[in-house]
């Protein structure tokens, strides 16, 4: 299981597509299913529809959410290869009985379809390229700022490490947040 290219919960750690390609190769070599958790990285956030596309690989299982409904409604999907799907066909005891109270919500489904329509009609991914370059330039320019120790970006994701402590308890991030809120 990997978060392709951007480890969001680990502090926006960005790694190279080579790592993902090697992980795919190893999964193939040892006949292990590769699961890409694209909940954060999917829907163009890295500049491509799926972050795994940067490495030109396809996972066996892809998990998506958040951007699936434009972040407006709880909506998620788990996509699989035909090989995995075929494993659940046939006799009833082979079926994958999966369901819960909120499966197939009609409002969430309608919003997800509308998001896909907007992505295609407004060519969101093409616009993302220009925005990604602007974000990269903005974050790169911060490297010379006092208190900024590391910057990185990929697509719509930009992050920087601030000096003066480390981890979630450091107050530098809170000071930036407070200044940003004061500026609207």
Task: Identify the residue ranges that each predicted region occupies.
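Conserved N-terminal phosphate-binding loop of PLP-dependent enzymes in the Aspartate aminotransferase
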Residues: 1-184
